Amino acid sequence: ALDADIQLIVVNNQGCGAEQRAHRLNIPCQVLDHRQFETRERLDHALVTAFLEAGVDLIVMAGWMRIVTPVLIEAFPNRLLNIHPSLLPSFKGLDAVGQALQASVRISGCTAHLVQADVDTGPVIAQAAVPVLRDDSPASLATRIQSQEHRILPWAIALAGLKWRQALALSTNRDQG
């Protein structure tokens, strides 16, 4: 079991599966449609407000297909966890599965990492590899990668939370000492 409480789920597509599941499980859910914001920074200000009001300690960006700005990153330093469908540092950004197939690699996978200002560059928390088969399509490879994302994400959340708690304890001890 994961030592965490879900304080808030934020989605950017109303009616998506995550929103429906949150409602079914009585988890607070907020829709922030990125199309309703003039800039990414304005969206990220709204995210910061929502997360602070909910008392969020760690943000898990699973299925959040938006690049975040320093507004969000600086408000939650080393507390944004992203899951990406490649073995970073290979195949950053969009269409990582397509990039892997185009490069004819034999192994691909997924990476859970902390978010930094440059896309898909933060410290790696966990990775899982999957073979790339000769007859793989983007859909078949993505399906195998996604099953590994589901496997490593809880573990990565636990590790990221532990790192954050340790850093908080060290900071508190320094301030008191």
Stretches found by the model and what they are:
Residues A1-A46:
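Short, surface-exposed acidic-centric catalytic microdomains
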Residues H23, L52, L101:
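Anion (oxyanion) recognition and catalysis
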Residues Q30-L32, Q36-I83, L88:
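Helix-adjacent hinge/juxtasegments
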Residues A4, N12, A62-L170:
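Donor/substrate-binding cores of folate-linked one-carbon enzymes
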